[in-house]
From Swiss-Prot:
Keywords tagged on the record: ATP-binding, Ligase, Nucleotide-binding, Protein biosynthesis
Entry GO MF terms: asparaginyl-tRNA synthase (glutamine-hydrolyzing) activity; ATP binding; glutaminyl-tRNA synthase (glutamine-hydrolyzing) activity
A GO BP annotation: glutaminyl-tRNAGln biosynthesis via transamidation
Annotated SUPFAM superfamilies: GatB/YqeY motif, Glutamine synthetase/guanido kinase
Record organism: Burkholderia thailandensis (strain ATCC 700388 / DSM 13276 / CCUG 48851 / CIP 106301 / E264)
Domain of life the protein comes from: Bacteria
Alphabetized PROSITE patterns for the sequence: GATB
Record text on subunit structure and interactions: Heterotrimer of A, B and C subunits.
Name used for this protein in its record: Aspartyl/glutamyl-tRNA(Asn/Gln) amidotransferase subunit B
Pfam families reported in the protein's UniProt record: GatB_N, GatB_Yqey
Summary of the function given for this chain in its UniProt record: Allows the formation of correctly charged Asn-tRNA(Asn) or Gln-tRNA(Gln) through the transamidation of misacylated Asp-tRNA(Asn) or Glu-tRNA(Gln) in organisms which lack either or both of asparaginyl-tRNA or glutaminyl-tRNA synthetases. The reaction takes place in the presence of glutamine and ATP through an activated phospho-Asp-tRNA(Asn) or phospho-Glu-tRNA(Gln).
Catalytic reaction list: L-glutamyl-tRNA(Gln) + L-glutamine + ATP + H2O = L-glutaminyl-tRNA(Gln) + L-glutamate + ADP + phosphate + H(+); L-aspartyl-tRNA(Asn) + L-glutamine + ATP + H2O = L-asparaginyl-tRNA(Asn) + L-glutamate + ADP + phosphate + 2 H(+)
Amino acid sequence: MTQWEVVIGLETHAQLSTVSKIFSGASTQFGAEPNTQACPVDLALPGVLPVLNRGAVERAIRFGLAIGATVAPRSIFARKNYFYPDLPKGYQISQYEIPVVQGGQITIQVPANEKAGKQAYSKTVNLTRAHLEEDAGKSLHEDFAGMTGIDLNRAGTPLLEIVTEPEMRSAAEAVAYAKALHGLVVWLGICDGNMQEGSFRCDANVSVRPVGQEKFGTRAEIKNLNSFRFLEDAINYEVRRQIELIEDGGEVVQETRLYDPDKRETRSMRSKEDAHDYRYFPDPDLMPLVIGADWIERVKGEMPELPAAMQQRFVEQYGVSAYDAGVLTSTKAMAAYFEAVVAKAGAANAKIAANWLMGDVSSQLNRDGIDIDACPVSAAQLALVLQRIADGTISNKIAKEIFVAIWDEKAADEGAADRIIDAKGLKQISDTGALEAIIDEVLAANAKSVEEFRAGKEKAFNALVGQAMKATKGKANPQQVNELLKKKLG
């Protein structure tokens, strides 16, 4: 039986976060009434000329530096010629032979797949290029009684098209790459990453070949995948389709396909024979883009600390695991919140801070469907909760209750934890004599568990600990309860 290898390359369109379009001064704001943000340049009216947006170029430079790519000192804009109703000029301004960003790489973390028996691993994906181009308008097919409406608000919006080498070997790797790239462009501030609004969308080139064969199989390109789930589902379906087709004696046709999320399948859009011959040629209205070394150095000096460097620093500075560091640097906001907590609670509490962010804080954020930026518990408030655990004022169980209380009341005061502790009498019982008296009562009321423990049943001891904690309403130190119980049980 033939063993198959999957070959995947991704082309990703990241909408650059400029205020105006790439070749005009029209706004890029999402959600405006149709055709209210299209100026004469976007509409291709006679006598207008494009003027390159410096901000778009700077964002491309920033991306190139972040991935260790070559930023071309001289690149060319080209006309990509094709006809479509939402493309007013009859061509798209893009880059072809000489892109602004060349090469580079992104390291991805592929999660474990227990069902398939695969462990987590890291992999470096090489990039071919990233080039600047303008977006097309939008064709609207609904609510027009069999006709198509054209909205040109999006026409001319700046895009950075990022192209990988065909090095990914599974849908899991493709999704891991897409997530890493998404996180990076958002971290750099060059793209807002809003997939629902089309700010970040992928085209997947998928083929299969027998294991060991060097020659690539015939590929299909799946267009405009705007969610990580769609990307994974589309690739998995396409891989199954191609393998079944070949094993049934058929041949894969090079074509463009669309993903149908309702049916969870891909369907043919156009074959190679119908594919466009774009007839690229240099745009005579735009001078070559020349980027000097001083410009690159200035952008480099303004770059934020990159996620990989921050992960390494968190491991070395705070003693957290590599995995934890990866989670904590998943977004710039999460990393900033963590460091703000540690700055207040002290470096000695860094590990417990990491545990709280990945546990209770993330759980509450998911429950309420919000990001860390909107967390109602400030870093200073959480830091005080952690300090009260560390100094023995409260137990971990009580700390969780206090955290939820601060969250639910959206307390504004930095000392909210202390206020709630005092108001509800939540201080941990530290008086050994008082705790011993409670434990004596627990032992007297649970004679059966005492007998079972002395007969060698360890579970009985845990039951006694639980009863003691219940009797103290969770205000006892669990470690102290353990020690006193062991002492009294001999």
